[in-house]
A protein has these predicted regions:
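Sec-dependent bacterial lipoprotein signal peptides
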Residues: 1-21
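Short loop/turn and low-complexity linker motifs enriched in small/turn-promoting residues
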Residues: 20-147
């Protein structure tokens, strides 16, 4: 009976972690980006954070390389024109750091979903490159901010 509690705790922790982790689906080059009009000298990266009840008060900065490009607040969206082709590290940090690498090509369009997962104190950022179809659909549900 003494060994029941640690085994139960370990099994519960494993189930919770598996349920909370994002499902990663590899993107093919066809679905990862869309073409912009011919002759465009930049890549367009769309960042968005869908409205969720969990963590709606917490915002975090999303960086491309070394500079902040977007503030991920609940129900927000933003666009970045990136002129340097090649892989770029997109990262965010609250109590933990999350990063993804985008294979940026000029003349292409990319979508990055920013969400917030459970953390010990304030939540952990999650960044995920999504397909063009899914990104456009989710981005359409977020209102454009008025200036």
């Amino acid at each position: 009976m003494r060994h029941f509690y640690p085994a139960f705790f370990a099994a519960s922790l494993a189930v919770c972690c598996a349920a909370c982790s994002p499902k990663l689906i590899p993107l093919t080059t066809d679905t990862a980006s869309a073409a912009l009009p011919a002759g465009t000298s930049y890549a367009l990266v769309h960042f968005y954070r869908p409205s969720k009840l969990v963590g709606f008060l917490i915002g975090y900065d999303v960086h491309m390389g070394d500079s902040v490009k977007y503030r991920a607040k609940d129900g927000s969206r933003g666009n970045v024109r990136w002129v340097t082709p090649g892989p770029v590290t997109v990262w965010a940090k609250t109590e933990a750091r999350e990063e993804i690498t985008l294979p940026v090509q000029t003349g292409r369009e990319y979508f990055v979903r920013c969400t917030l997962g459970a953390g010990a104190l304030m939540g952990r950022p999650h960044l995920q490159q999504v397909s063009v179809e899914q990104g456009r659909k989710e981005l359409a549900s977020i209102p454009v901010p008025s200036r």
